[in-house]
Structure formats: structure tokens, C-alpha cells
């Protein structure tokens, strides 16, 4: 799927300014450039374009609130100076698996004053002598390179993940979840009540039918008893009648 079409689907009837996270992994970029993404995505904090065939990010729109950018598994070899201009608040940048060969290519990242984490796995630059020491020297604001700090201590999960929602947003999500859960619970209770009422009604109908059937049986028994009484009375009268004839 082409990138601009993917963005349209990801919007899900929202406006670009409502979107804080946008994942475009594995879609197709025509001519190796970002397409369909505009500066209308002014609230965007997380953008992922993994394996989309990018060769350049020169047309990246202005994204002032972007905190984390995933650009791994592409064919980017330069143009990184655009990041400081378009994404001044970027904290986490993943360039793993791109065509970055030397330190001069990443030197423009010095202007990203808030850059905290940088990943360059599977880039040729990692084969240089004293690669880690030189990157930390070139980019003193960076705390974690390829998931480890200057002392080779692994970054905490929160720093590796990079994108963490604010507490207020988490509270809002929890409130929405609680409201939804309560709504589902109320609906289940209503369904149970309706089922109980249906069972009561069906039980009353069964009792009525049983009562009706019992009534029919009682009527039949009464008729049989009446018939037996008539038969016995006839038998009693017959001998009397014979006696009268003899007289």
C-alpha cells in the first residue's frame, strides 16, 4: 500500500491534528520520499516509517511535538540536517539498517539539543574504530547509543521504548476504559434481567398449561364416574322390573 493511502486509512475519520501516533511500517514510498504527511499533524509525537523504502527525509513536514522517530530499515544516507529544523524536540531517533557510513553524516544531529537516544545498528558507521566513543564525543547530549550508555549500561525500558504517553493521557484512557467497562456491565445486567423475565413468563405459561391439562383430566374422570353410576342404577332397576312382570 502506498504511504499516502496508508495515512488516510490511519486517520480513521480523525483530523490530522487529533493524531499523536502514526505507524506507517512496510508501506510503499514513491521515489523514496515521505508522502501524505503534512504540517497539519501538529500534535504528532511518534512517527514510525520502518522499511518503507525511504532514501531521503528532505520533505519531512514541520512536526514540533515529535518525540520519537523510527526510520530503520530504509536507504537513508544523508539529509539529517532537516531533523533539527523540522523536529526540534526529537528525543529518540532510530536509524538502524540505513546507509550511514561515516560520522560526518550524523554530525547535523548536534543541533537536536533534546536528543537522548540514538540507534545506528547495522549501519556501516558502526564498523569504524572507536565508534561509540566518537559518537558520544560528537553528540554529547545523547545518553544512549544502540541501547547502552557511555558505561555500557543498558537503557531502561522506558528509554528504549521512547514513546510514553503523559500521565494525564493515561488517566483519560483509564477513565474511558472504566466508562466502557461499566457500560458493558450494565448491558449484561439488563440482558440477564430480560432473560429472567422471559423465564418467569414461560414458567407461568407452563403452569397454566398444566392446570388446563389437569382440568381436562378431572372432567374426564367425572364423566367416567357418572357413567359408572348410571350403569349400576340400571342394573338395580332390571331385577325389580322382572319381579313386577312375574306378578
UniProtKB/Swiss-Prot annotation:
Domain of life: Eukaryota
Annotated organism of origin: Mus musculus
Annotated InterPro entries: AN32, Leu-rich_rpt, LRR_dom_sf
Function (record text): Multifunctional protein that is involved in the regulation of many processes including tumor suppression, apoptosis, cell cycle progression or transcription. Promotes apoptosis by favouring the activation of caspase-9/CASP9 and allowing apoptosome formation. In addition, plays a role in the modulation of histone acetylation and transcription as part of the INHAT (inhibitor of histone acetyltransferases) complex. Inhibits the histone-acetyltranferase activity of EP300/CREBBP (CREB-binding protein) and EP300/CREBBP-associated factor by histone masking.
Region of interest (Necessary for tumor-suppressive function), residue spans: 150-172
Residue spans of biased composition, Acidic residues class: 157-230
Record's comment on post-translational modification: Phosphorylated on serine residues, at least in part by casein kinase 2/CK2. Some glutamate residues are glycylated by TTLL8. This modification occurs exclusively on glutamate residues and results in a glycine chain on the gamma-carboxyl group.
Reported tissue expression: Predominantly expressed in the cerebellum. Expressed also in cortex, lung, skeletal muscle, gastrointestinal tract, spleen, liver and heart.
Record protein name field: Acidic leucine-rich nuclear phosphoprotein 32 family member A
Record domain LRRCT: where: 123-161
Chain spans, region Interaction with E4F1: 165-247
Primary location group: nucleus
Modification type Phosphoserine: residues: 17, 158, 202
Modified residues (Phosphothreonine): 15
Highest classification ranks of the organism: Eukaryota, Metazoa, Chordata, Craniata, Vertebrata
Location of this chain's protein in the cell: Nucleus; Cytoplasm; Endoplasmic reticulum
Keywords attached to this entry: Cytoplasm, Endoplasmic reticulum, Leucine-rich repeat, Nucleus, Phosphoprotein, Repeat, Repressor, Transcription, Transcription regulation
UniProt-annotated stretches for the region Disordered: 150-247
Pfam families per record: LRR_9
Assembly with partners or alone: Component of the SET complex, composed of at least ANP32A, APEX1, HMGB2, NME1, SET and TREX1. Directly interacts with SET. Interacts with ATXN1/SCA1. Interacts with MAP1B. Interacts with ELAVL1. Part of the INHAT (inhibitor of histone acetyltransferases) complex. Interacts with E4F1.
Effect of a null allele: Mice are viable and fertile. They have no derangements in any of the major organ systems, including the nervous systems. Moreover, bone marrow cells from mutant mice only show mild decrease of colony-forming unit(CFU)-myeloid.
LRR repeats by residue range: 18-38, 43-64, 65-87, 89-110
Protein family: Belongs to the ANP32 family.
GO cellular component: cytoplasm; endoplasmic reticulum; nuclear matrix; nucleus; perinuclear region of cytoplasm
Amino acid at each position: 500500500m502506498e504511504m499516502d493511502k496508508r495515512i488516510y486509512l490511519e486517520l480513521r475519520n480523525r483530523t490530522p491534528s487529533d493524531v499523536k501516533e502514526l505507524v506507517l511500517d512496510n508501506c510503499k514510498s514513491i521515489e523514496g520520499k515521505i508522502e501524505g504527511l503534512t504540517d497539519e499533524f501538529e500534535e504528532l509525537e511518534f512517527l514510525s516509517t520502518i522499511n518503507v523504502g525511504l532514501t531521503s527525509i528532505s520533505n519531512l513536514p514541520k512536526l514540533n511535538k515529535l518525540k520519537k522517530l523510527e526510520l530503520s530499515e530504509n536507504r537513508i544516507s544523508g539529509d539529517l540536517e532537516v531533523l533539527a529544523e523540522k523536529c526540534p524536540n526529537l528525543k529518540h531517533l532510530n536509524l538502524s539498517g540505513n546507509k550511514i557510513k561515516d560520522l560526518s553524516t550524523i554530525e547535523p544531529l548536534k543541533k537536536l539539543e533534546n536528543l537522548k537516544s540514538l540507534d545506528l545498528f547495522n549501519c556501516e558507521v558502526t564498523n569504524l574504530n572507536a565508534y561509540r566513543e566518537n559518537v558520544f564525543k560528537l553528540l554529547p547530549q545523547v545518553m544512549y547509543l544502540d541501547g547502552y550508555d557511555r558505561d555500557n549500561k543498558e537503557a531502561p525500558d522506558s528509554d528504549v521504548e521512547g514513546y510514553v504517553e503523559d500521565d494525564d493521557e493515561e488517566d483519560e484512557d483509564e477513565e474511558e476504559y472504566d466508562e466502557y467497562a461499566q457500560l458493558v456491565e450494565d448491558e449484561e445486567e439488563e440482558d440477564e434481567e430480560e432473560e429472567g423475565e422471559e423465564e418467569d413468563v414461560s414458567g407461568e405459561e407452563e403452569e397454566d398449561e398444566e392446570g388446563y391439562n389437569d382440568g381436562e383430566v378431572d372432567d374426564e374422570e367425572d364423566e367416567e364416574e357418572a357413567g359408572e353410576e348410571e350403569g349400576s342404577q340400571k342394573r338395580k332397576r332390571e331385577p325389580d322390573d322382572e319381579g313386577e312382570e312375574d306378578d
